[in-house]
């Protein structure tokens, strides 16, 4: 699991992934998956985990904070999350968490929410964006992008027509395929090596279309849809 991004799970039932560096130090992002499941997925190497960062307070991202904290995992998040979960440490503008440096960036959602730029001990840069209607921050020298691609407008329109389907307002707080593509097209892709499409709806996204469009926008072949137990190896010129 060295030099990799490991997806534990993503979706409305829970979100969690791990960033691993070359020394097998790990950083957890979001804690919406149970401790036993995460621990099993990482082959019981919880002692290798430097800490965890949580994007926002919603259950599918934060539910298991107390359990991880009680198992000696230092958890960091914003003030809104800390108010409910006092076990959390408050994120600053720049955070050293073991072998990782984490820069949080506020993004629009229906609760305070953070995107994260993570820098590993090997100077690999991973940008994580979830649960937002749009991301204004254009970070330079991103090597790997984990970005929400929750739904696409055409699929929702088709469902409304064929199934009398009503989305409600919740989708306005998530990234559509169109929003995701707009970000990829406008970001600095000079050092981009991989993209993971995150938090995708099982019913409101044409996943084949999303992957094809994101691959075209990114200009690289290493574009995948997140799924449980997916591992994306991170390749760096220094390795």
Feature annotation, model-predicted:
Residues 140-228:
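Cap/insert and terminal regions of metallo-dependent hydrolase folds
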Residues 57-62, 82-84, 110-112, 135-137, ...:
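Active-site environment of divalent metal-dependent phosphoester hydrolases
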Residues 33-34, 58-59, 77-84, 90-94, ...:
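Short, polar loop motifs at secondary-structure junctions
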Residues 25, 34-77:
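Active-site metal-binding motif and surrounding structural segment of the metallo-beta-lactamase
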Residues 1, 51, 222, 231-239:
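Catalytic phosphate/metal-binding cores of nucleic-acid and nucleotide-processing enzymes, i.e., regions
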Residues 95-148:
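Catalytic core of the metallo-beta-lactamase
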Residues 1-42, 114-131, 144:
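Conserved beta-strand hairpin/beta-sheet module of binuclear metal-dependent hydrolase folds
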Residues 70-75, 85-104, 142-147, 221-223:
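Active-site regions of enzymes building and remodeling cell-envelope glycoconjugates
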